[in-house]
């Protein structure tokens, strides 16, 4: 072993500890263990009281500093007799000599956790109450100890207390372990400071005029899982979650099946969002982030699944299924006959998971309904794109605001199918054409680089079912050829955004074919 490796593995005995915690979980067991091992404990405020109340020897920090706690506890540990003991690098003889000259003892261990700032904000507390939960002394002690990791070990999580006691019994932490603890401590501080800075920016100093895109924004991410690989086996991948965000698919509970893959997550996310684009019971079947089928039903979720599957049974093989309502036993029995990678729903009826679990590999997830709002992030080389999610909530998404360009007004059943097709189209990669009937997609043309090819693909997939169906297009028809392709296949009504310089030609083609044509004034590209 090299000399550097030997230094990393050498243990530094723990003789003196500084403890100051808001979260008292595990505190007494820790203090008892340290006391039994002969470690001197210095502590603050309520932490010192909790330790002393158990008959455990503890030195209040004010005895160390000779200065009382002041300003409602805002100043307790911000004192040279504390921070010199934290920051003295005992590898340097001059630091050790300075401590001896000043009569200051060094600490080998710091145990600190911070005021619950984020929890206070989420509770709806007042601005002043939130400000009081911005930790100053605790953050300073953690940063000082982490900086001085050659001499001090720092622990910020009660889950680490077992390791502390094991290290004390084993002769102390190694330098390698102290480096790891220091890294974890700075991660903890960074996450905390990002939360404070974000709140300050949005609450105390919002930009004027107000904007959804501030000059600065910060987020912290925690690794939730290392995945088998990325989109392809030669790519490494992992899942990270935002601890400050509301629960989403990344926090889904897996009830059965193999570990989720990268592609499972991307497809499940697309399916989950597509299913919740609709108010009725809806099932979306997704593969490669595109719909194999989407359907709604007023009868049952099983009926919605049956209709979604019938759209494209061949492509649905090995797909990902999402339902926006509880999966019934009937639906589970149908799904169990089909090779399925993932099924995700808000809940499952009694017995449904047992039926699905007969297939050992299918991943069965429970996830909360996706929350509206937030931001979508997409990395680009050297930067990051941010946009508001496309949520089908514009005026143009309401059929009451559609413009009838030509043809007879759609009857109730036809209009219902047009609305369904329009909402389903949001989930399809552009250029997108969705042909629908009876609350179900029957032909989907997706991801084409021109709209007429998307129309041809949708017609080909729909086959004989296209006659009498309706169509939604995610963007305008730039030429009449796409609409003519659909009209020749027998569709009766089409909805599209409009806005092309050739809108008049497209409308004339619809009039000639006897097709009802609506304009929404809003598009729904997906890239």
Curated annotation (Swiss-Prot):
Keywords per UniProt: Hydrolase, Multifunctional enzyme, Purine biosynthesis, Transferase
Classification via CDD domains: IMPCH
Domain MGS-like: 9-156
Disulphide bridges, residue numbers: none
Coiled coil, from the record: none
Pathway: Purine metabolism; IMP biosynthesis via de novo pathway; 5-formamido-1-(5-phospho-D-ribosyl)imidazole-4-carboxamide from 5-amino-1-(5-phospho-D-ribosyl)imidazole-4-carboxamide (10-formyl THF route): step 1/1; Purine metabolism; IMP biosynthesis via de novo pathway; IMP from 5-formamido-1-(5-phospho-D-ribosyl)imidazole-4-carboxamide: step 1/1
GO MF entries: IMP cyclohydrolase activity; phosphoribosylaminoimidazolecarboxamide formyltransferase activity
Record keyword Transcription regulation present: no
Matching Gene3D superfamilies: 3.40.140.20, Methylglyoxal synthase-like domain
EC identifiers of the protein: 2.1.2.3, 3.5.4.10
Pfam families, per the entry: AICARFT_IMPCHas (PF01808), MGS (PF02142)
Lineage top rank: taxon: Bacteria
Reactions catalysed: (6R)-10-formyltetrahydrofolate + 5-amino-1-(5-phospho-beta-D-ribosyl)imidazole-4-carboxamide = 5-formamido-1-(5-phospho-D-ribosyl)imidazole-4-carboxamide + (6S)-5,6,7,8-tetrahydrofolate; IMP + H2O = 5-formamido-1-(5-phospho-D-ribosyl)imidazole-4-carboxamide
GO cellular component entries: cytosol
Family: Belongs to the PurH family.
Domain remark in the UniProt entry: The IMP cyclohydrolase activity resides in the N-terminal region.
Protein name listed in UniProt: Bifunctional purine biosynthesis protein PurH
Gene assigned in the entry: purH
